[in-house]
UniProtKB/Swiss-Prot annotation:
Protein residues bound to heme c: 192, 195-196
Gene: qcrC
Protein name, as recorded: Menaquinol:cytochrome c reductase cytochrome c subunit
Main localization (coarse): membrane
Keyword Nucleotidyltransferase in record: no
Ranges for domain Cytochrome c: 178-250
Cell location: Cell membrane
Subunit-level organization: The main subunits of the menaquinol:cytochrome c complex are a Rieske-type iron-sulfur protein (QcrA), a cytochrome b (QcrB) and a cytochrome c (QcrC).
Amino acid sequence: MHRGKGMKFVGDSRIPAVRKPNIPKDYSEYPGKTEVFWPNFLLKEWLVGSVFLVGFLCLTVAHPSPLERIADPTDTTYIPLPDWYFLFLYQLLKYSYASGPYTVIGAIVMPGLAFGALLLAPFLDRGPERRPWKRPVATGMMLLTLAAIVYLTWESVVTHDWEKAAEQGKIRAEVEIDTNAEGYKIAQANTCTSCHGENLSGGAGPSLVGTGLTAEEIAKIAKEGQGSMPGGIFKGTDEELQKMANSSPA
């Protein structure tokens, strides 16, 4: 019979099983390329986090968040603008194939396919290669998506009317409008309030509050028009025009 054939080693009861408690090494026993979690590693993390926190707080103090006037849901002329990380979706909804009757495609279907593909990427690309040039399909899709996001964001920034956006969101001083005044009733009768708002603070037309215009300039604009406002809208007499201009909150 060969030695060990058919035999099973079940242990030797004469050899004691020494179990030592899991005690961490002393600080002095660590080699030069390693370090203890506390205080070395964790203290460095805290210091880096503190620097970023202080920098972020200084940034918020130096550049506070821009505030606009109180939101008015009845103002149909207001053009909303999302945060910068949603600008590419905002621009996508401007195209004909993703807006109007096709809003569902631009708002749900296309982003859903993109984020769904991102979630399924680890399951679809199961190859052993990790170098980008060895994974042409995955790398190409990533670069195409990144290029589309950058282009749509840039296009949204370029085509947005920033001057109009700053003007429409400007916080204006509240001015009490006497709706019983004769000048206000004249403006209301000539449909001025339908464009400039019931409080003359702006609507489809610009605000008439705090414009700095003189009564003569207001009368001239009301008679001849200016910009997108055509002339001949005011149908009253010269006397009514003068009363309206003199009572303007400009």
